[in-house]
């Protein structure tokens, strides 16, 4: 059981959380979003992210979903890997970049799984959610013609 933190460029993180609330009705307190404005100082961004991480982590575990690898939100998120929770326990953090809606839906659906399992299922959900629709139409057409 891990907390889930969405860290992305403004307004992506909060928009993703709003989408999850729309789909699931309500979202547990251990799932939050932090938007990173374009010109915010990285130190300020990190302090906001750290505060949110400490609020949502469960049993010292945290899954972070971020939008773009190498961008400020992902870089800020990576600094969480060396942090401790409020009890002084080193956080166990898994960070996934490339956030998409299927990834988020998978994370929310499996929110009570162990961190490693949650991260793997979430990653698979994000990858499986990327499709080329024309290719799918061809497959469906072929199946119908048989």
Where do the language-model regions lie?
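N-terminal loops that bind phosphate or other acidic moieties
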Residues: 2-146
């Amino acid at each position: 059981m891990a907390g889930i933190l969405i860290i992305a460029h403004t307004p992506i993180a909060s928009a993703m959380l709003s989408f999850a609330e729309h789909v699931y009705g309500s979202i547990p307190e251990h799932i939050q979003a932090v938007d990173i404005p374009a010109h915010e100082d990285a130190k300020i961004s990190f302090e906001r992210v750290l505060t949110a991480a400490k609020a949502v982590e469960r049993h010292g575990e945290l899954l972070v979903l971020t939008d773009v690898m190498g961008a400020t939100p992902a870089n800020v998120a990576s600094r969480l890997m060396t942090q401790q929770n409020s009890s002084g326990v080193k956080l166990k953090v898994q960070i996934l970049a490339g956030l998409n809606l299927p990834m988020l839906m998978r994370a929310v659906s499996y929110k009570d799984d162990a961190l490693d399992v949650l991260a793997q299922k979430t990653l698979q959900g994000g990858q499986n959610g990327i499709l080329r629709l024309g290719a799918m139409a061809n497959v469906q057409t072929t199946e119908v013609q048989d």
